[in-house]
Amino acid sequence: MPYIEPLAKLIAEFTKFEGVGEKTAARYAYSILKRSDSEVDDLINALRDVKQKVKFCKICGNYTDDVDDVCEICRTRDKSVICVVKEPKDIQAFEKVKSFKGVYHVLHGVISPIEHVGPDDIDIKGLLKRLDGVKEVIVATNPDVEGEATALYIARLIKPLGIKVTRIARGLPEGSVIEYADEMTLSTALRTRVEL
């Protein structure tokens, strides 16, 4: 039996979220039906707030809600070491480890010829503009084909400038996703990084 129209619309909206299939979307929709009006209003307000208040940091590309558009990490941390990641959620994974004291740079993607994503389609230019005074760039893209290609491309651009370029190391199997790695694995990968 098909879903009634309002439920079908809500399920269709939930399936637009990354990693949410129809069954999970239906569970979310049915869960909302069980909630009180005030709980649903709270959810609506939280969704509105996140869209209106959260922006990209103008320095690193991470999410921020600061009025000056600069995240707390960029304001307060050691700027001589930059850890380059694919997307903002990778920063959260590294921050759980609590061992990295430098700053980050979010590429907002990786080089992927199959998906027609080249170096100009991700924020490599923003990274290059931040290199004054930097001693090391740690490339922490996922250990898959696209992540490796991106790491090598970045290394070729930065190494001639006399800046040390390293890659997160063992502990992350090839093809894995940083966001899902546990804290110990990420800590080891950071600590045992290798020079490119």
Task: Describe the residue ranges of each PLM region.
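Extended, structured, electrostatic nucleic-acid-contact surfaces
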Residues: 1-18
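Conserved phosphate/pyrophosphate-binding and hydrolysis machinery centered on Walker-type P-loop NTPases
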Residues: 18, 37, 50, 62, ...
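Extended interfacial segments that mediate partner engagement and assembly in macromolecular machines
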Residues: 25, 75-141
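Short Cys/His-rich Zn2+-coordinating modules
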Residues: 7-12, 35-58
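Long C-terminal interaction/binding lobes of large macromolecular proteins
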Residues: 101, 128-196
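Cys/His-rich short segments
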Residues: 46-91
